[in-house]
Amino acid sequence: WETITGKLEWTEAIRGCDGVVNLAGAPVATRWDKKYKETLVNSRLGCTKRIADAINKLPEKERPSLVSASAVGYYGTTRKDEAWTEARGPGGDFLASLCEKWEKAANKAKTNVTVVRTGVVLEKGGGALGKILPLFYLYSGGPVGSGTQWVSWIHREDLVDIMIMALKNPKKFKGVVNGVAPEPTTMNGLCEAIAKATNRPNWLPAPGLAVRVLLGEGATVVLDGQKVVPEKTMEKGYQFKYSDVNSALDAIVNGP
């Protein structure tokens, strides 16, 4: 978003729009140092503040609704089996604090705001699977860390459809919804589903210590997790296409 700063008046860019979707944010599943943590913050808060300001400059009746991304990192991490809903408060780590600030920035917009706390997005061409699938095809795939950590995931089609539904029903979807599938899995469960879909073995784990050496503090994204369910999302009427990870992976790997 920084590349268009000064080249485009954002308020004029959104004038006449029914809704705005904000997905801006630097990747978290990489090595963090002090400078990159600043990038994680600025890439989210800077853009979101600009969008909220642009919306607020419009007359009230002309303001579009806002669908703004957040992440399940808002809740912190746990190894417990308790399922967390949208009602749970924020955790106490860096990502939780970042998500909390990110959401507050979005809610500065004086319009109907939907915050989507997104889990691990499964898609063939990128994201987590973009890094994991090639390893399985090379017969070298396996769980990262202990394998028992929770993975709250969502198929990309479901995430897109949730956001579209929020755009079409801004008053109904005002507030927070979890962008995760109804059936979270573990890292082992995810890798077993990948192995089944690719017809490859799930046998070569990546030790947690090695991942921490490689990613530093950023390793928390893949080594720790949280069991999150989309209670409010379903209460608002969304019906998931992919509720279980096996059907999602089969569609991604073997679908058209």
What is the predicted function of each stretch?
Residues 93-96, 111-115, 119-151, 156, ...:
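NAD(P)-dependent short-chain dehydrogenase/reductase
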Residues 49-93:
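Conserved Rossmann-fold NAD(P)-dependent oxidoreductase catalytic core, especially the SDR/UDP-sugar
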Residues 1-50:
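NAD(P)H-binding glycine-rich loop region in Rossmannoid oxidoreductase-like domains
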Residues 162, 169-217, 250-256:
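Mid/C-terminal beta-alpha module of Rossmann-like enzyme folds, strongest
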Residues 20-24, 66-72, 116-118:
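SDR active-site strand-loop-helix element
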Residues 220-256:
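C-terminal amphipathic/interface module of NAD(P)-dependent oxidoreductases
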Residues 122-131, 165-177:
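Glycine/proline-rich active-site loop of Rossmann-fold NAD(P)-dependent oxidoreductases
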Residues 42, 78-115:
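Catalytic helix-loop patch of NAD(P)-dependent Rossmann-fold dehydrogenases
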